[in-house]
Amino acid sequence: VIDRRAGLPHWSPLLFGVVVLAGVGVTAASVLTSVPVAPGVPAPPGSVRFALPALRLAVDACSVASVGLGVLPLLLRGLRPNRTRPVLVRAHKLGLGLGAVWALAALLLLWAQAAELAPSGFGLGTAELARYAAEVGAGRALLVAGACALATAVLHAASLRPHARPPEELPVLVALLGQLPLALTGHSAAAANHELALLSMSVHVMAASAWVGGLGVLLFLVVPERSLLVTALPRFAAVGTVCLCAVAVSGVVNAVVQLTGRPEIGWAAALLSTGYGWVVLTKTAALGVLAGLGGWLRFRLMPAVLRHRAVPVTLWLGLELLVMGLAIGLAAALARASLS
């Protein structure tokens, strides 16, 4: 739907659907992968248990969107500036605000993670919070993520200036860098074969971010400009295919490492009889659906777009993004979970 008065798409229903599906995914996966508190260990307050997956989802969503905004200039590279400048200005303004929100979400997640270990929950003091941030790997990772988030905001702000703009590749590189610390301090770090687990998780996170974030900016910023879509869609299709393959392969590797980490259970039983395994199966099903939607878009709809025919690109990209929202929610919960 196009709001002719503003000249911008009115995406509220779609964004609401993505948020709802992401929330459903993170809630369901958190319930499935929850483990009882060990005897003698005080359970964190309910507010902390609720806030942790929600804030992790917020951090992941902001970082993915930041990667997508960083990818956009690369999809439009080589086109005349008078055609791309209006879209890029909107993207840089969004990137400026999103970087600040990402940094804030990272700090709130840092607070929630420290509160999980503190007897007083969210009432912990600044000294306890500072100790967690300085001494715990997950705390340091969030500080790095927050710094990268602020750096992306600064880079987007600099790109709004008419002169002395930073290199086009820099925002996406910094956004990807901001994702790695959390990937390297999650459950993969505790896996038996942690080197392989960390490598596969890093590839998985970066490829998924470029794919999901790229599709989001394509849908929200490029689709309304059909003259730009003819150039950007084939480029994104090529990037998306590579990212899909990387996500699939790295996801399988990481799942195998995690599911074989408990020899007394056996990988088949771990996959079929644990909450962790069910979440992995659900993510795999979502990936299969995304592959089907992406294949239809690339081989059936894209040729029509290149011939400037009217086709429902928005519908198919919107369906992809809805499924991706569910997958991001599952991943946000899975990042904090372990095979139990």
Residue ranges and their predicted role:
Residues 1-340:
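Polytopic transmembrane helical bundles with strong interfacial aromatic enrichment
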